């Protein structure tokens, strides 16, 4: 009898072993209640049906069934966890692949085309307003400037841009044309004339209208919006108070009872007032109306307290850097501690590079440059570490990143962004000067570091460190970076009667190859 029991137990344990081996290949099933597992029910039933088993044998058998069931559940959970992790990993790989494909389709995440990346918000016979897409829609690399939006206003001759206010701080730059800005304070309207090169800051919520006072030419205004809403970064809206059917007045959202009570005017008169305008938000006006909207005298005060008058002309300011090959004018937060530039931590710059000339290769320490080409053609190159992973399919065993060249031809209406620390260079074409205005964000304490010209960062490096960094004699390195042509710059500067101030004269120079390399491609 003992031999039969042992034999039966051996057979049963062989049956359990077979079940264990099937776990790895069986399909995982969710069980809410332990007794509902058919394998567990079958196992326990067979234990009870073995007549040759003693009560002790049956207990051992039932315990083996329970132990097998627990092991099965643990194994199923493990398989489920492994399956979940595998799916998550596959999903991450797909997302990374899609992101990489998206970036490969757009090899210039810092370049914005006029015909591709601007959307038209307003368009009438009198003009249009185009807004550049959010910077983060182009690339996640631009999250730091997500809350800045660039817009371009184009208005035909003798047009009126209806009164509105924005839920954003706005910096206006007059690219071309002659304008009148009407700024509404609590008690009156302050009228300010804008000439080409004028820049002005409009505080958020300030009602304003714009007039193109020129009889023949279009007006082009660049507008940098800095939305003040913390809940929707990078999103700004315009609100029309005066209006009718087109543009629709913001007051139309209120009930007639509320409007009648607030304005103490019957509904009929209110309907007459808010039902007349249907010409759109930009429309032509007569010469007499333009004359009536012009300032009667030159303003000497600013109706909004708390800051100095926020208007200046960057074209007329003395250049920060200038020679026969280019001119850079900067107005920044360090120029006036009480200015709106200080509060917005913003620098405004104007660059004019002479044809067949270039800026030095340089980078900003703190500022992110948002540049708009306003005239001329040229070329841009940026050194970018973020793009290097997709520029090469092979991984190099190195202790430093690789760098990818982002390059683009430049023409009027294009926008490009240069993050801090990224070396870049701009080059004017052979036939015309390259003119750009730049909004430099986070500009406080910003410094420019150059790689070419007098006093560049390599030439300023001490010789021992220079030799260690290049693993090359410092005399040979100095022969490359201590260019002798900056001496020619001094001579040319004297011929042009230009002041010589260290790096300033060597910030711009002609775009020409060394004599031994002339005739080869510059971008080789």
UniProtKB/Swiss-Prot annotation:
Signal peptide coordinates: 1-29
Region annotation Disordered: where it falls in the sequence: 73-107, 384-404
Gene: SBP
Membrane protein topology class: Peripheral membrane protein
Reported function: Plays a role in sucrose transport.
Biased composition (Basic and acidic residues): 73-102
Entries under Gene3D superfamilies matching the protein: Jelly Rolls
Classification via Pfam families: Cupin_1
Domain called Cupin type-1: residue spans: 110-271, 312-478
Protein name: Sucrose-binding protein
Tissue expression from the record: Associated with the plasma membrane of several cell types engaged in sucrose transport, including the mesophyll cells of young sink leaves, the companion cells of mature phloem and the cells of developing cotyledons.
Domain of life where this protein originates: Eukaryota
Subcellular location: Membrane
One cellular component (GO) term of this entry: endoplasmic reticulum
Main location: membrane
Keywords (A to Z) from UniProt: Membrane, Signal, Sugar transport, Transport
